[in-house]
C-alpha cells in the first residue's frame, strides 16, 4: 500500500521541494496575513546544498528569540488537542497580530517539521501554533493513529477557536501552513471555515487521491476493492478482540531492495534527524495508521466544491 508519511521540509535530498515551498503559493498566502516584502524575500533565498544547511533549519531547532508554551484546547467534539504556542519575545503586547496554524505531515506529529515551521514564522513576528492532529501525538482520540479526515480538518478549526479568542491575535488574520497530508486537511477545513483566511501548503499530498489511485495512478480498481474487503474483514476481527492492524508508514529497516522514497523517509523518521516517539506510543507504531480506518481516505475529496 501507499506510504502515508510525506517528504519533510529542509530535506537534503529534496532541494526542489524546498524551493517549491517559497513559491507563489506561500507568498500569496502569507501576504494576506500581512507579511512584509522583506520577510518574503528572506524566505526566498536560493536552495542550499545538503552540507550548507544551517543549524536553524534543523528539525529540532530552538530559537533564542521565541518563547514556546505547551497548550491544550478542545475541539468541537470535546477531544483535547495538543499544541505548541510560539510567541516572539519582542511581541507588542498592546496590539493584535496575525497568527498561523501549522499542521504536521500525515503519520507524523508536531515535533516533526511543524514545530520548525512554527518557530521560523514566529521569528518573523507571527503568533504561531503547531498542532497534533486528533488521534496523534499529544492529542486525544482512540484508537491511537486512527484516520478521520473530518476530525483532522476539525483540528484546524479548533485551533482557530483557540487563537481567535487569544487577546494577542487578530482573528481576521489567521492562516494555516499545512505540511504534506495536512495540506489537504487544511484545505478541507478552509472550505467550510471562513476564519481560515490563507492557506499555504508544503509538499502537499491529497490523501484521498493518493489512497484511491496510488503512486502515479498505479492502483487498479480491483486492488482498491481488495483493500476495502480486507479492511472490512479486519473490523470483524478487531471487534471480537483481535489485535489492531497497522499499515503503510515508514519502514523500520533498509534493505538492498528499498526504494528511493523508502530511503528518504527512513533518513528522517527513523534517524536522530527527525525521529520522535510521542509519550505512550512506541517506535514500532510511529507513522503507521490503523488499517481499518485508513480506508476512510478513499472517501476524502478535499478539492471538491473548493469554490466555497
Segments from the language model and where they lie:
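The serine-hydrolase catalytic nucleophile loop
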Residues: 107-119, 133
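Alpha/beta-hydrolase fold nucleophile elbow
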Residues: 168-180
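Conserved serine/cysteine hydrolase catalytic core
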Residues: 296-308
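Alpha/beta-hydrolase active-site loop
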Residues: 146-167
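Alpha/beta-hydrolase-fold enzymes
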Residues: 187-272
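Conserved alpha/beta-hydrolase
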Residues: 121-138
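N-terminal cap/lid segment of alpha/beta-hydrolase-fold proteins
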Residues: 53-95
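Short beta-strand element of the alpha/beta-hydrolase
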Residues: 95-105
Amino acid at each position: 500500500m501507499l506510504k502515508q508519511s510525506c517528504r519533510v521540509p529542509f530535506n537534503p535530498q529534496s532541494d526542489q521541494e524546498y524551493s517549491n515551498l517559497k513559491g507563489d503559493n506561500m507568498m500569496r498566502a502569507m501576504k494576506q496575513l500581512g507579511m512584509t516584502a522583506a520577510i518574503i524575500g528572506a524566505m526566498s533565498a536560493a536552495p542550499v546544498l545538503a552540507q550548507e544547511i544551517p543549524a536553524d533549519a534543523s528539525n529540532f531547532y530552538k530559537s533564542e528569540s521565541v518563547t514556546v508554551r505547551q497548550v491544550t484546547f478542545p475541539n468541537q467534539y470535546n477531544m483535547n488537542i495538543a499544541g505548541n504556542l510560539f510567541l516572539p519575545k519582542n511581541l507588542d503586547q498592546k496590539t493584535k497580530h496575525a497568527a498561523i496554524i501549522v499542521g504536521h505531515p500525515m503519520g507524523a506529529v508536531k515535533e516533526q517539521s511543524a514545530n520548525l515551521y512554527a518557530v521560523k514564522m514566529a521569528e518573523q513576528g507571527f503568533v504561531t501554533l503547531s498542532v497534533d492532529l486528533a488521534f496523534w501525538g499529544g492529542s486525544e482520540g482512540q484508537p491511537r493513529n486512527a484516520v478521520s479526515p473530518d476530525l483532522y480538518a476539525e483540528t484546524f478549526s479548533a485551533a482557530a477557536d483557540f487563537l481567535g479568542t487569544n487577546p494577542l491575535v487578530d482573528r481576521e488574520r489567521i492562516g494555516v501552513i499545512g505540511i504534506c497530508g495536512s495540506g489537504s486537511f487544511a484545505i478541507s477545513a478552509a472550505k467550510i471555515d471562513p476564519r481560515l483566511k490563507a492557506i499555504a501548503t508544503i509538499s502537499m499530498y491529497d490523501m484521498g487521491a493518493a489512497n484511491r489511485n496510488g503512486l502515479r495512478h498505479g492502483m487498479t480498481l480491483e486492488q482498491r476493492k481488495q483493500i476495502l474487503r480486507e479492511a472490512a474483514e479486519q473490523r470483524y476481527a478487531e471487534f471480537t478482540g483481535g489485535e489492531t492492524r497497522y499499515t503503510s508508514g515508514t519502514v523500520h529497516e533498509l534493505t538492498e531492495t528499498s526504494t528511493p522514497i523508502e530511503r528518504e523517509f527512513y533518513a528522517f523518521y527513523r534517524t536522530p534527524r527527525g525521529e520522535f516517539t510521542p509519550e505512550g506510543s512506541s517506535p514500532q507504531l510511529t507513522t503507521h495508521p490503523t488499517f481499518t480506518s485508513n480506508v476512510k481516505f478513499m472517501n476524502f475529496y478535499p478539492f471538491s466544491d473548493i469554490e466555497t
